[in-house]
Amino acid sequence: EVMMRGTFANIRIRNEMAPGTEGGFTKLYPEEKVMPVYDAVVEYKKRGTDLVVIGGKEYGTGSSRDWAAKGTKLLGVKAVLAESFERIHRSNLIGMGVLPLQFVGDMNRENLNLKGSELISIIDIEKGINPRDEVEVEFKYQSGDIKKIKMLCRIDTKNELEYYKNGGILQYVLRNMI
């Protein structure tokens, strides 16, 4: 629980969903209540809501990258959608079973007008993916509008794909030992 509470709690983090706050705060939807990330995660888990993280450029840059990926997984995040990824953190996310997806071209969270209230679906992911596939992602806005875009799957190698398919590198190793 300590590591989960510490994930996304760095005071340099600015969550655009919770303007005026520093560190580990987010907004719980549909209530639009600003609260600690951990508390929001607990509530979303009770509701059965899967989570994604939306990031900017060089997502994951920092000194505690391995724990950043572990904490992200422990919080129940299924995917990270970002403009670009720090190389090692991208690999660590996959090693934890979290899907890294990269915006293509000039597409980003700003020109999609993402506020945090959108329902996000990764279309046909259950049918399987290959390294560096284009993946369709659907954003359903509170207004009812729907926007679909293509994103680049940042699982770059066949080995990484096997780790992801198994839920992470530890699960992959354990399954291959049995």
Where are the predicted features?
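Fe-S-dependent hydro-lyases/dehydratases of central metabolism
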Residues: 1-178
